[in-house]
């Protein structure tokens, strides 16, 4: 077990299996020392636990927890390419999309769920640049989607 996975276990979390792609793409790809994940939905055991727009059917607090799940799924995608999460030199960037009701403006707080998980699991290596974007709708009516870019150390 990697140190990152041990830290996740301390947080009461287990790295899930990689979420299978919903269309014609890979969950993650490596280019040089970087791994780019596809957008990760908050899938748990193959299903979305909640659907709808944040600020309407989904509360900001629920969405923040879903963003945390997205980040956990993104780490699983990184591991599928890197082989070991301890190879992460740093998280470079996080991009979060929030399916938002027309008057919802709390996207940064929602995506904090992903950012806080990465910081808790990776320490200083988890500090990153970030975008949090409100959108009208996401695939499968998911409330949140998160993608990450990480830099790896040499094996």
Please identify what each model-predicted range represents.
Residues 1-155:
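Short, polar/acidic, helix-capping and beta-turn segments at strand->helix junctions
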């Amino acid at each position: 077990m990697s140190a990152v996975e041990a830290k996740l276990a301390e947080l009461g979390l287990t790295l899930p299996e990689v979420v299978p792609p919903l269309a014609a793409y890979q969950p993650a790809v490596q280019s040089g020392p970087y791994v780019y994940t596809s957008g990760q939905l908050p899938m748990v055991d193959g299903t979305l636990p909640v659907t709808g727009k944040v600020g309407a059917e989904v509360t900001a607090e629920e969405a923040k927890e879903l963003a945390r799940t997205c980040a956990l799924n993104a780490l699983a995608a990184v591991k599928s390419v890197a082989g070991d999460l301890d190879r992460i030199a740093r998280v470079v960037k996080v991009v979060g999309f929030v399916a938002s009701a027309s008057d919802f403006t709390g996207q940064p707080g929602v995506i904090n769920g992903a950012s806080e998980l990465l910081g808790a699991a990776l320490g200083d290596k988890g500090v990153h640049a970030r975008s949090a974007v409100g959108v009208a709708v996401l695939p499968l009516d998911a409330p949140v989607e998160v993608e990450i870019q990480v830099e790896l150390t040499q094996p």
